[in-house]
Structures are given as C-alpha cells and as structure tokens.
Amino acid sequence: MSTAGEFNIYASSVETMKKQIRVIFQDVEGEISVELDDSHSPKTVQKIIKNLPIEVSIHRWGDELYTEKTQIAEKPENAKIKVNLFDVAYWPEGGALCLFFGPTPISKSGEILAYSPVNIVGKIIGHSTEEENFLNKISDGARVVFK
C-alpha cells in the first residue's frame, strides 16, 4: 500500500517540463519564441537547456531551418521522420536543431518529413502568418542564437 507522499513523488517524476526560449536571427533583427517540452525527448531537452545560449549558423531545406552542428550530442530518443507543423527537433545524425514551418523537399501528401529521424523537443509558439512569412525570409547561412 502506498502513501499519499509516495504517490506525489511518483506523480512529480512523470510531469513534463516546459521552458520558453527565444530564437534570435541576428542578420535580420528578428526573433521567434520556442517552447521546449521534454515529454517526447527529455534527455535531449535537458542537453539543449544545459548548452544555452547556442550561437550557430542556420541553413534552409524547403520549409525547414536547421542549424550547423551544435555541441549537443544525443542519440535518437523516440525519434521519428514525420513531424508536425511548427515542431522543433534535434537531428541526431547531424547534431543540429531543426525548425519545421512547412514541407521539406521529401514531404508528400501534406505530411512534413524530416531527412532522417529527429527527436521532438518543442514547438514554435505564437505562430502566425507573420512569423511564417518571417521564417521564409531567413537566408542560408544566417546567424542565430537560441537563448
């Protein structure tokens, strides 16, 4: 028989952690907000938080922005290829952070597909038509800071 205290300890260990961060695009003087959520990839989210701020160049692949290799080194964690609109992910194969705001070159039938399996770590929040248009204006090689 468990006590209420034991139940509370268990309950708190399965709660998800959410943290809002900013992604600042230095070359265009703009930013977006991202909510990190460890419900899918808790180890990956913890490594991202420990490495903040992350200052890197960003590249474009269709309607996905992905960073150059980061200092984050994490294995696939509940990794998947099919992602949702505005998902933020970590790409274990490339050591990069990814922002999905539309189809990639390999997407089909309205699905958004990553190049290879990614760990989902959060969402672009407050996404509006303005932010979608803003992300479309980001050029390959732009400097970005996650903080």
Regions found by a protein language model. Give the residues of each.
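Glycine-rich active-site loops that engage anionic ligands at enzyme catalytic sites
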Residues: 34, 38-47, 51-147
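Start-of-domain signal
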Residues: 2-55
